[in-house]
């Protein structure tokens, strides 16, 4: 057992040792002569030393930028001059002064770091620089001196050691310790500089022009760069001075060309008045084309700086200021520091951040994050793997679609959903083959895909592969929002031909072109696997698998019987199975799965209808669609429980995306269809509806073009007029066009509409023009009065006798008024009467039903039905015939002519 007393003593000793080591380390740091940190800079190593002091390579901690720390004694008179003039310069070929740190005994200057070392060392390594490089470097040096002269400053210490090279090989002028302000025609007397670079007037200690001595020094530099040695050099300093004053430099014709000799001779003229100006030097033929470029650049910079307001104007500077402000930095203090050239820590931070931003902008190849690069690789690999094993003719259209996928959309920040999809892979067996059509997945209405797709998933099933695979498939299938695969094609075709209700599709007419139905799958009774993974959310119900042993001939026969042409190339071999991803919604758990996918496309950009491409590369018609089970609008299913729901899809809906059923007019062989391009629509009875069809655009639809997501009462006030129909006595009625009530659908947020309501008297005005009745209801009644209880309906409605769905009949007892018996041209078009208040109508009288004893006309009861857009229990098919009204009249006559019997 461990002694607790001994363990506690051991812990105490360890703590004491840690404290002691930390104290010793801090004490050694204070007593050490070697510096490790100065301000925000961490000293890395010493890179130079001179009479002025030492130069260190340091790292700026906030930006991780390398700088040169030049130190000097505080009592050095040249350090003040250097800082004062150096901070005025802002030129590409002059080193930048970032920050000045003043301590008790030292002055530290943070300068731009030039990793190319000094030009003197560069010349020693090459022994002689080529003429082309000499022309470029000398043009840059002359441009820097021209800039300083334009700022009325003379350098007075131009030499190879004061010219640095950056990492790109550009010249940078530095060391402004002898710089002073000098105006035109001002003579100086102070002798300064290095002897071998001094002009003759300095050697003779005469008054001199500061601009001319800099030009002499430039001549010495150019001669040295071309030949590799100084023009006037000797071991004895006195002899060197004598040569400068009395001798001419030696020109080797093999090394120095004529134009270079002309320029050097003019620069090294003994008479200062004969030396050219820097503008003339930059225009000399030897420096072309570099001289003219540098001269123009320098003049533009000077003009911009003299005009003022150059700071904080560029796009980079504004963006940098915005970021600093968002980070909580006082940007106003930074601006004041830069404008007043304080060279403090704020100035150093700004200049280093700006240099870092310019470096990123000037980068030849912009950097990309690893995520973007990996996504691009995944796309290329997925495209390559998907193309294996498929013929070129099949892949030709699909590859064109896949190439259209852009990387910017893949990383769109506006995406409000997370998708995942494993790439599709193929398996081949002896008895069956799985063929995947690259363009078969035309399902752009769903926003999320499930992880499980038939086929073996990839080994590296990471998030980026899922995102890239989803968007590649989504881009290639950017249209046909309601495309689904039906395995019971033969059943629906045969049943619809016999007149039984089935899940057959409507013929759709879009912009004048009729799209033919397509058979995508062939039922196989011997297989338990699904031919296509059905979308469980499409059309409000799950289409069951076909269990009949239907042959291909039966499918062709049943398709031809109803006038549908089935593409023969789409009737696949029964050994071929087509697989599609199973769809799943992650968006909302409140709304039913039926309402989540009924509107089709969730992306407004992909709302256009386009035909799919078959296996042989031809454009084939869209597949047979599920017939809607109710005349309740399909769009209204997208209102998640209520119109106030905010978790529904936010995409815009186009009227052309809805399934528009065709209505057959009695006695006519043609089919009247609704086109999205026409405003006026004609139904089977010849009546015209302006803008809207019966329940095609729902009154409660949250995505309707006429309705807003907020409390819009437009659809309530513009409900479709009611037409009385009946299916029971029409033997020729094609029931494949009928619409059955939908069960399990969600109720809209609006209340039930009673039989006494109307749309602001619109129906009444139309009926009044035809002389059917007089209008006594007020058009200014509140819209909300349409909502009434079911108890009021029971008082105003009686039910006709007969089989099938009950037909509501207006109770018109005591409401008889004098009126005319007017009919339409066909003699049997009657209209339901809607009022906002009590019944005050002029009913229609029948000539053949009259009480001769009392000479009172018998009321011909008018059967009505409610608007079909609200999911009413009284909803029935719009395509019902007119015989319902006759049946109601006959039933009333049999009961003795009393409409309330």
Swiss-Prot record:
**What EC identifiers does the entry list?**
2.7.11.1
Q: Where is the composition biased (Basic residues)?
A: 759-770
Q: Which GO terms describe its molecular function?
A: ATP binding; protein kinase activity; protein serine kinase activity; protein serine/threonine kinase activity
Asked if the Swiss-Prot or TrEMBL record annotates the protein with the keyword tRNA processing, the reply is no
Q: Supply one GO CC term from the record.
A: cytoplasmic ribonucleoprotein granule
Q: What class of enzyme is it?
A: transferase
Modification type Phosphoserine: residues = 456, 533
Q: Which family does the similarity line name?
A: Belongs to the protein kinase superfamily. Ser/Thr protein kinase family.
Please give the name of this protein: Putative serine/threonine-protein kinase YPL150W
* Species of provenance: Saccharomyces cerevisiae (strain ATCC 204508 / S288c) (Baker's yeast)
